[in-house]
Amino acid sequence: MRFKFILFLLLTLKSVSVFSQENTDYWYDGVAYTDSTELTSGVPYLTIVLSKEGDQMPKAVTVSNSLGAFSFYGVPMDIFKDYTISVIEGNRNAASYLCNKFIEKPSFVGNINAHFKYIPIGKTYSETILTPTKEDAKLLLLDYLKKKLELEYEDRVLFPKASDAPYKVFANNAEIPDEKIDMILQQVPMEMIKQITVVKYNTPNKYFSGVLNIRFTFGDEPTVDKETRLFSLPRIK
């Protein structure tokens, strides 16, 4: 049910144990890629779960963008605990990777690299491009999406009408902060939108049905250095 997903979001993003050393000074950023030494091909639109050792519920769930990049920025974590990053395809855990705990506090504050190599068995989603016309220019983004797609909007979450698992929403290939979702969907007119990529998983998982990647007529998209030598997380499953 949809209320279960919304409750899951609240629990995973807001829960911090008073007995832990969790904070948001550190977070995992990474790229899912298919080459063992250099980033030559990112793996797009993977559902990625972050779990902490000893916890039954995942800490957070996200999706890689079209370049294979993902981030758990803002998720409270304890760097002195092991974490696991898992790839979910349909109803199965397709792969898991170990993020080793720190023994001593690092000298830096910020992101911790969590790149991993993953080769999908096959394409797990379909992709459609929506390009607005002149007649759509004055429509608000949310109204346009409701016109083109069978979806509903509840508590800052977009759901396909036929599913209880929502869409992950990107703007210019970057995650949208929760506090900006309402503003972007309900105040931005379609004349500011170049196109929308609609990704639908062939087999929706319990976290997401797919992705909406909104491309504005302005602004830059994030890039990934294709020459960067990558540290890869060890695969444990």
Language-model features and meaning:
Residues 55-69:
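Short, acidic Ser/Thr/Gly-rich low-complexity loop/linker segments typical of extracellular
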Residues 100-132, 212-218:
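Extracellular beta-sheet/turn segments enriched in Thr/Pro/Gly and aliphatic residues
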Residues 54-57, 78-108:
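A short, solvent-exposed loop/turn motif at the edges and junctions
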Residues 37-53:
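Short, ordered, surface-exposed loop/turn motifs in non-cytosolic proteins
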Residues 155-199, 225-236:
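Periplasmic plug
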Residues 135-174, 204-215:
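Extracytoplasmic beta-strand/coil segments of soluble accessory domains associated
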Residues 65-76, 183-184:
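Short, surface-exposed beta-strand/beta-hairpin micro-motifs centered on an aromatic residue
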Residues 131, 143, 207-236:
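N-terminal periplasmic accessory domains that precede
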